[in-house]
């Protein structure tokens, strides 16, 4: 009887170990430290920290089920879908290709690698009131489709008054 039980247990794959490849789809999330920024009528520079109130950090993450997606280069694509006049995107990663003479370059879209399923980038308010919609996507290789999510960042909404209207 124990031989039959052992054979049945072996046949069904019992005994633990890896669950193997799962068929779970990718999910993506995008959040910002602040979704409302003041108008930058003084044209203050972009930066990270409390000394830079016109800049917010955005965090993009993707999971396959409950686990982070695999790492790699050029995994996330993030774009200013609309509202570019309210502010551009920045890497602020210190890489030479993302700055000119030590000054960070502004972008309408960024491409990011994945480390532990996520990465971060930045949005910097301009002197134009409005809402910027930022969309990020990741390719789900199992489903062979793009998975995306968006977030809105309001510039100039904190006071209710626009400092500059065109």
Task: Give residue ranges: language-model regions.
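Short, exposed coil/turn segments at beta-strand boundaries within extracellular/luminal domains
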Residues: 141-149
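Short flexible loop/turn segments that cap and initiate beta-strands
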Residues: 54-55, 61-106
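Bacterial Sec-dependent N-terminal signal peptides
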Residues: 6-34, 159
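Surface-exposed loop/turn motifs at beta-strand-loop junctions within extracellular Ig-like
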Residues: 64, 127, 138-142
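Short, solvent-exposed loop/linker segments at the N-terminal edge
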Residues: 37-54
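Short, solvent-exposed loop/turn segments enriched in Ser/Thr/Gly
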Residues: 50-58, 117, 128-134
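Extracellular/luminal low-complexity segments enriched in Ser/Thr/Pro
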Residues: 99, 106-129
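C-terminal edge beta-strand
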Residues: 149-156
